[in-house]
Amino acid sequence: MKLKVTKLEKAAILPKYVHSDDSGLDLSAIEDLEIPPGESQLVPTGIAIELPPNTEAQIRPRSGLALKHQITVLNTPGTVDEGYRGEIGVILINHGKNSFKVTRGMKIAQMVIAPVIRVEVEEVDHLSDTTRGSGGFGSTGLTSD
């Protein structure tokens, strides 16, 4: 399966897997910028993609940035639809107490290509019963007991 990528900027870095068994391709920043504490920024990558049929790209945080700097993807996972052909941008948010500098070439997020299942929506008067029912938001408890 092929992911077609166009560099919109000569210095853009193509997405790549670091290890052969990685699920996410690393995405890199194309410019330097700063994200103050509590704020978010759209970080450009300088690339556009053409996804394989019936797939989406999910933009996800990098665990190292989250753990060490409290930087994460704001709308995680960000969804890139199959038909989108514009620049891939990553919305990063700084949950930390210090300003964070994004530098050109820095790995800022990972992109996972996933299958998409399209459904036909059917309106019904009643849904089938389950043991869980409408219980949500903590209804299963906090411990495994």
From Swiss-Prot:
SUPFAM superfamilies for the chain: dUTPase-like (SSF51283)
Cofactor(s) named in the record: Mg(2+)
Reactions listed under catalytic activity: dUTP + H2O = dUMP + diphosphate + H(+)
Pathway: Pyrimidine metabolism; dUMP biosynthesis; dUMP from dCTP (dUTP route): step 2/2
Top-level taxon: Bacteria
Keyword list, A-Z: Hydrolase, Magnesium, Metal-binding, Nucleotide metabolism
GO biological process, one term: dUTP catabolic process
Listed GO MF terms: dUTP diphosphatase activity; magnesium ion binding
Main enzyme class: hydrolase
Residues annotated to bind substrate: R62, S63, G64, N75, T79, V80, D81
Residue ranges of coiled coil: none
InterPro entries the UniProt entry points to: dUTPase (IPR008181), dUTPase-like (IPR029054), dUTPase-like_sf (IPR036157), dUTPase_trimeric (IPR033704)
EC number of this enzyme: 3.6.1.23
Role summary: This enzyme is involved in nucleotide metabolism: it produces dUMP, the immediate precursor of thymidine nucleotides and it decreases the intracellular concentration of dUTP so that uracil cannot be incorporated into DNA.
Family: Belongs to the dUTPase family.
HAMAP family per UniProt: dUTPase_bact
UniProt xrefs under PANTHER family: DEOXYURIDINE 5'-TRIPHOSPHATE NUCLEOTIDOHYDROLASE
Protein name: Deoxyuridine 5'-triphosphate nucleotidohydrolase
